[in-house]
């Protein structure tokens, strides 16, 4: 599988993004879903055309004039049988375009079978929910948890917030979920009806979404199962995984479903975590994401939470275009004693972590939540379990301040996540150029619900975001078999222009590169302030020698808050003893952030916090620059 972006950068809904394109050696699989555009006429005309040809139809909320036609009578993945229907649409003079959707794989993450407190709940599994309040259960480390108790004691339980679980459906009749189910915001895109109930199987395979829903919104004090992180929030089911193949139109429709009712979208799935796939959202889904962060929640932006991936040390989540998107909050996991789970992927785009299991055989070390048939389970695991926990914490923060934007939530995540007692056996904890501590696997640390809601209460919306192409290397450069190819780009970050980026949020290195063995490539990038981001680690199972990376946007959050101006360094080399060849064809530096200091106007209540440190840094920088401007002015007068 090959992934990348088309050569031009497109502007959609006020955001720059590259349209990812993918090529595969496998024969394409065609589905019973069509993207249709009419020459003229609105939704009524589309319904008329669809009915005449035996199709159902849905209007796409994020794209004017485009419709989703689906034909339940067509056998899925049968090109020959669907050809007649495709030709009928194409011959219809009212139809401008009829694009049959290709199918591709999307996998649930973490579907694995794993072998005294101030807040009292009568739910039978509550005392086993160590990730909520860790007192040392299942040989865990006391105090290593989400600190939800502090948020609850402050009165925040997720009331007024709706979380959409994009998955294989949820059992909305489950007695621990029924009272918090938001039917109006729910839909089944696999069956095209408003009832996202999971398809029961003998192996309980479709319990994934129900388990995720319980982590977020399971009711409290009802003597059933456990308690959700945001137990007074509402949960919506968006069923979209349970079909032979995924399509761009189903993903885009799910991600853009009811953006004025759904505040947070939780996704515990993605491309196959096999250590050799490079894949991400297609054009419609990218457009839907851009539309969501720009227009969702009344313009404050939909909040997308993504599981970082379960490929372990054999994979890298920067090869997953969902987890590495600027528009998602990518969440990794730790187990109850602070160690990494064996399936955890590391990458520079991960923003923070929550909890799951994947290392201990103790049956009570898993995540306790709701299950199919009205049951409960202690065996939920993977980063699948981590993402909904984060969605629950964000729901608590939104209740504290409904005015938070999608970017505010990312800033709060960076500032309130904590190292706590997390331990990465491979990558050390480091500080970036403005003193923020981060880890290549855990991001900025484990979420702290108490700290987040307290900061959210006083939070002022961060300044406007700008985008700058910091420079580009277009001449082909050979990567040596031993040693490294080292390139530099010096940028002023568009200073003096209206899109000047002074304080960084996200940085993308858009790279085109080929190698005799793609999985042996290692790519690092160092910022002007000296922060090294590992953009790509070795993936020993990836033996691709033909397609490489084509305009692939590797992303880092590790330079958050830094000054973008200066010299950036890119290093490419091979890991392993076998002789290798490679060619870097392009490196384009994309800078995203603000012109004005994002924390200057924020209220500081904890003078030991990262916010206090960052604000002090900003004030000193602003003072230094003011002095420099004054000196220049005096010298110019003389």
Swiss-Prot record:
Catalytic activity: Release of protein hormones and neuropeptides from their precursors, generally by hydrolysis of -Lys-Arg-|- bonds
Glycosylation sites: 375, 514, 524
Source species: Homo sapiens (Human)
Alphabetically ordered keywords of this record: Cleavage on pair of basic residues, Cytoplasmic vesicle, Disulfide bond, Glycoprotein, Hydrolase, Protease, Secreted, Serine protease, Signal, Zymogen
Presence of the UniProt keyword Glycoprotein in the record: yes
Highest classification ranks of the organism: Eukaryota, Metazoa, Chordata, Craniata, Vertebrata
Family: Belongs to the peptidase S8 family. Furin subfamily.
Main location: cytoplasm
Annotated GO CC locations: extracellular space; intracellular membrane-bounded organelle; membrane; neuron projection; nucleoplasm; secretory granule; transport vesicle
Name of the molecule in the record: Neuroendocrine convertase 2
């Amino acid at each position: 599988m090959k992934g990348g972006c088309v050569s031009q950068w497109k502007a959609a809904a006020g955001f720059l993004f590259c349209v990812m394109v993918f090529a595969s050696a496998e024969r394409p699989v065609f589905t019973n879903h069509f993207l249709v555009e009419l020459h003229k006429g609105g939704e009524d005309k589309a319904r008329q055309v669809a009915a005449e040809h035996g199709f159902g139809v849905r209007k796409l909320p994020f794209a004017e004039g485009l419709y989703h036609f689906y034909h339940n009578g067509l056998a899925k993945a049968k090109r020959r049988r669907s050809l007649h229907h495709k030709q009928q649409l194409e011959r219809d003079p009212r139809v401008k375009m009829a694009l049959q959707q290709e199918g591709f794989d999307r996998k649930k993450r973490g579907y694995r079978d794993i072998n005294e407190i101030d807040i009292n709940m009568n739910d039978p599994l509550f005392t086993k929910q160590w990730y909520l309040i860790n007192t040392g259960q299942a040989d865990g480390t006391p105090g290593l948890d989400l600190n939800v108790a502090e948020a609850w004691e402050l009165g925040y339980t997720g009331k007024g917030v709706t979380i959409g679980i994009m998955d294989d459906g949820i059992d909305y009749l489950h007695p621990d979920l029924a009272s918090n189910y938001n039917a109006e915001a729910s839909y089944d895109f696999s069956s095209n009806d408003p009832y996202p109930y999971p398809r029961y199987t003998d192996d309980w395979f479709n319990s994934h979404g129900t388990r995720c829903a319980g982590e977020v919104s399971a009711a409290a004090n009802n003597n059933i199962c456990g308690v959700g992180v945001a137990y007074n929030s509402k949960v919506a089911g968006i069923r979209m995984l349970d079909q032979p193949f995924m399509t761009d139109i189903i993903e885009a429709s799910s991600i853009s479903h009811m953006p004025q009712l759904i505040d947070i979208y939780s996704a515990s799935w993605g491309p196959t975590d096999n250590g050799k796939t490079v894949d991400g959202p297609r054009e419609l889904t990218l457009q839907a994401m851009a539309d969501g962060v720009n227009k969702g929640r009344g313009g404050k932006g939909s909040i997308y939470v993504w599981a970082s991936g379960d490929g372990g040390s054999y994979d890298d989540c920067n090869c997953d275009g969902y987890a590495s998107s600027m528009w998602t909050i990518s969440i990794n996991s730790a187990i109850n004693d602070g160690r990494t789970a064996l399936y955890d992927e590391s990458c520079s785009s991960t923003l923070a972590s929550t909890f799951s299991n994947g290392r201990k055989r103790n049956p009570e070390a898993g995540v306790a939540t709701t299950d199919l048939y009205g049951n409960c389970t202690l065996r939920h695991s993977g980063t699948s379990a981590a993402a909904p926990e984060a969605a629950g914490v964000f729901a608590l923060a939104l209740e504290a301040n409904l005015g938070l934007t999608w970017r505010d939530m990312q800033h709060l995540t960076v500032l309130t996540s904590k190292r706590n007692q997390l331990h990465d056996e491979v990558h050390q904890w480091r500080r970036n150029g403005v003193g923020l501590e981060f880890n290549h696997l855990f991001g900025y640390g484990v979420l702290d619900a108490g700290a987040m809601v307290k900061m959210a209460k006083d939070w002022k919306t961060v300044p406007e975001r700008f985008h700058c192409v910091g420079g580009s290397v277009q001449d082909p450069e050979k990567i040596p078999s031993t040693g490294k190819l080292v390139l530099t780009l010096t940028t002023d970050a568009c200073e003096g222009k209206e899109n000047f980026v002074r304080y960084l949020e996200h940085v993308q290195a858009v790279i085109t590169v080929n190698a005799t063995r793609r999985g042996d490539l290692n790519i690092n990038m160092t910022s002007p302030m000296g922060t090294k981001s590992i953009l790509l680690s070795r993936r020993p199972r990836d033996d691709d020698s033909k397609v490489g990376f084509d305009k692939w946007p590797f992303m880092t959050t590790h330079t958050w808050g830094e000054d973008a101006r200066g010299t950036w360094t890119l290093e490419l080399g091979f890991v392993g003893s076998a002789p290798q060849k490679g060619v870097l064809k392009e490196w384009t530096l994309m800078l995203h952030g603000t012109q004005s200091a994002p924390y200057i106007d924020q209220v500081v209540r904890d003078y030991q916090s990262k916010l206090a440190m960052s604000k002090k840094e900003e004030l000193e920088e602003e003072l230094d620059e003011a002095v420099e401007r004054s000196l220049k002015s005096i010298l110019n007068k003389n």
